[in-house]
Amino acid sequence: MKKNKIISYFHLNKSQIEKIEFFVAKIISYNQHTNLVGNSTIENFWDRHVLDCLQLSSYIFEKNLKILDMGTGAGLPGVLLSILGYKNVLMIDSVKKKTDFVKNIIKDLSLEARIQTKRIEKIPTVEKDIIVSRALAPLTKLLTYALLYSNKKTTSFFLKGRNVNNEIEMANKKFIFDFKVFESLSCGGGCVLQIKNIKTKND
């Protein structure tokens, strides 16, 4: 999907567009010395990254929900969700160069978001309403992490690729969970994987 169609689809206002453009420009500049995104994806950045992340807003209806972005990297999707007006986004990544980048973005754009430089399993186990992740780990590992911060009402949304069915099959060996698969709006044949009610099989 082209940039102008993405702007129209999500009804982005002038301020949101300017903030996203600033964010994208900073990623591309920073990417010259620190790997934030694959170089091959930069030319089609709005479809591959912006659209891929913004589509999560179609599933997260309340702006005040507590959101955990596991392994945020460049702030994808956490920064973009914050730009859309989600007010309680916590982003986690273990790589300081990446979290330093995101800290500066949060400051420059005056976003209501937080970033921590920690391994996911080391942050305080405060339950979250929504858990999101993109390009972090196979589903079995994501569920291991998500279970630490989930309650009966928590919903997770993982941006996944073509191999999602195999990942679900592998995860079913260790976990019981409810899931739905939604086709991604972005190019590349990916999907949005919705997960609820995670339990280990020996519970």
Label every model-predicted segment:
Residues 1-62, 68, 97-112:
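Class I SAM-dependent transferase core
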Residues 135-138:
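Short glycine-rich anion-binding loops that position phosphate/pyrophosphate groups of nucleotides
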Residues 103-104, 143-146, 169-170:
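Short amphipathic alpha-helical segments
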Residues 54-128, 132-133:
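Conserved SAM/SAH cofactor-binding pocket of Class I
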Residues 143-155:
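A short glycine-rich, Lys/Arg-flanked "PGG" loop and its adjoining helix->strand segment in the class I
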Residues 153-164:
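Conserved beta-strand signature within the Rossmann-like core of class I S-adenosyl-L-methionine
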